[in-house]
């Protein structure tokens, strides 16, 4: 029987420190509906793993309000015309399907996620018609006189009036996800002349993701995940990504509850401002100044690696390519670097150090440190 009381130690995973959000070309700099997110570095393969999971959650998991039914004075069914209104009821229904409403069903709110009936009285007299050239467009904003819903497209025309009239319009709004046909929507208190609509709840219009190569130090075997998200404005792309992440976390937590050993991960070496000088002092040390076996020292010397800086910038696979450099030497070097709180494949770019200039930079930093000590 396995002992589940002890944690398992796993090697570190390279993870992004943050997710960058950028505007999309052609969106006018707006991130209300279009945004691109970049996460790097990720371990090889994790770009596609996360990208596909997030894409599916974004497309099927998010909720938003939508109109699920409407009724109107004088309207008996969907297949009729209304005197004094240009559009027939079928076209009014189509226009209502294009209405975009925004509201967050907060946990502590009085209404929560319950469907709400929004009633509005539309009164149009002769002077209103005259001011509009004989035709007065009734927009989505005109129909949202109560309920606390915000119109994403307030100028969206629902119907057009050509003669003075007073009509009451009632819209039933519900929260949901995905797409529901009118046949699937069940209203417990449905009115006699209430017309049920198909409802598009999902606020996400399009999601694409791309995976590119990126580097950590000199190692290019990592993924960069680029995620493009377009919404209809009922939620922003940033909100959509945050909500979908929480949805995935909720589902993954089911599998985390299995009674098995827990994993803890080794932490990656982080070069912070407060220990930058301390790390530099270690990087300029000569290979012969640390306690390595003669075999390992000779292997590094034959590879023309003279300083710790030249060593730690090397990715592990690169070291194994050197002549006579085997797993035993690699293990010894990794353990020694770990004692020094360093590791192979470190990113030294903040010191201006790359694989092409590391030898010159280490000499320059060593001289700078010596000069500073002399002055001190």
Curated annotation (Swiss-Prot):
HAMAP family: RNApol_bact_RpoA. Its EC number is 2.7.7.6. It comes from the Bacteria. DNA-dependent RNA polymerase catalyzes the transcription of DNA into RNA using the four ribonucleoside triphosphates as substrates. The keyword Signal does not apply. Residues 276-376 are annotated as: Alpha C-terminal domain (alpha-CTD). One of its GO terms (biological process) is DNA-templated transcription. Signal peptide: none annotated. The keyword Glycosyltransferase does not apply. GO terms for cellular component: cytoplasm; DNA-directed RNA polymerase complex. It comes from Chlamydia felis (strain Fe/C-56). Keywords: DNA-directed RNA polymerase, Nucleotidyltransferase, Transcription, Transferase. SMART domains: RPOLD. It catalyses: RNA(n) + a ribonucleoside 5'-triphosphate = RNA(n+1) + diphosphate. The N-terminal domain is essential for RNAP assembly and basal transcription, whereas the C-terminal domain is involved in interaction with transcriptional regulators and with upstream promoter elements. NCBIfam families: PRK05182.1-2, PRK05182.2-3, PRK05182.2-5, rpoA. This is DNA-directed RNA polymerase subunit alpha. Homodimer. The RNAP catalytic core consists of 2 alpha, 1 beta, 1 beta' and 1 omega subunit. When a sigma factor is associated with the core the holoenzyme is formed, which can initiate transcription. Residues 1-259 are annotated as: Alpha N-terminal domain (alpha-NTD). One of its GO terms (molecular function) is DNA binding. Belongs to the RNA polymerase alpha chain family.
